[in-house]
Amino acid sequence: MRFVVYKHSLVLGDNNIVTKQFIVLKHDDGNLQFTDFHRYVKSTSRIKSISDDGNKRFSYVVKFLNFIFGTSGLKSIDQLTLEMVREFFTLYGLSQLPGDREKRKKSTVEKCVNAVLDFLTLYLSEREGKAKLKAEELYSTTTFTNSRGRVIKRKEPNFEI
């Protein structure tokens, strides 16, 4: 049994096709069991289009979920520790996760880190008091000004990757 991304397409109005992604558990016999983890995968854009499907962010989160439930043997994300998150990012960056075949660019690793940190932030803030890990333990927020003079807030992991 493992987590996979399930894509569902809807036809709206005049041949407008909207694809939504869900994180589901795929059992060994092929049956799918829907989860609500898709609620915690947020879009990178502030204004979300109805046709926004989360793109690659879902695949990063699914890799993370398969690692923590498969390798670490967790029964619930509430049992997650900072060491498990750190171990996933280290193995992901070194391309040493089970099933990895190719090397990754630094930018790809950073996208994965951001997607998983956003996922965990939303999940842990909703499960505050029930989960071992707190969102504040994962990252610190740094503020800087870009070339256009806009103030940008960036999440920096509290550990080396």
Locations of regions flagged by a protein language model:
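Charge-rich, intrinsically disordered N-terminal extensions
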Residues: M1-I161
